[in-house]
């Protein structure tokens, strides 16, 4: 597969972005604007928003995927309604597992919790929908495992140093 994990930010670069975006927002100086950081702002949206919780992706072929970055599905919008697509087994597994991690600096089932994505795809029978370079979920998650381990230490340190204060939003399935 052509996905280049060496293009992911290092844990040092990601930690820098964590601090820099908050500085830009004005929390510690800078301008009074609200910049978003897709990877590090899980605390503001209650973790991963994908899998139909607040968001899904429909690719050019019509496959309804949990996220623009996660190319697995068992539903196509050309064959089922959006409501039916949101009820596909993979999306139901997302809802059952969310939040994927109580540390919202590690919300993603692919980048920070790849073992969970692999389990969900395998258990639901979802198929690769990558139009350019399909790959097995084992291959994809195997490429993300080192990244997840490296980021975990930094993310846990940041989470402990800066306690989660944005508890007003979660909308998770009741467990």
Could you say what each language-model-derived stretch is?
Residues 1-47, 51, 60-61, 65, ...:
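Radical SAM enzyme [4Fe-4S]-AdoMet core and its adjacent flexible, acidic
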Residues 69-175:
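Flexible mid-to-C-terminal extensions adjoining Fe-S/redox cofactors in radical SAM and related proteins
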């Amino acid at each position: 597969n052509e996905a280049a994990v060496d293009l992911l930010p290092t844990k040092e670069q990601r930690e820098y972005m964590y601090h820099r975006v908050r500085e830009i927002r004005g929390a510690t100086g800078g301008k009074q604007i609200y910049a978003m950081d897709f990877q590090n702002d899980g605390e503001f949206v209650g973790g991963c928003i994908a899998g139909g919780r607040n968001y899904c992706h429909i690719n050019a072929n019509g496959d309804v995927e949990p996220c623009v970055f996660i190319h697995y599905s068992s539903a196509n919008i050309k064959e089922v309604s959006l409501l039916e697509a949101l009820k596909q087994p993979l999306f139901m597994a997302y809802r059952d597992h969310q939040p994927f991690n109580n540390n919202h600096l590690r919300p993603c089932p692919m980048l920070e919790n790849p073992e969970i994505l692999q389990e969900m795809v395998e258990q639901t029978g979802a198929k690769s929908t990558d139009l350019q370079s399909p790959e097995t979920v084992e291959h994809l998650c195997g490429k993300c495992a080192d990244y997840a381990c490296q980021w975990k230490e930094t993310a846990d340190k940041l989470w402990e140093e800066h306690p989660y204060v944005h508890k007003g939003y979660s909308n998770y399935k009741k467990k």
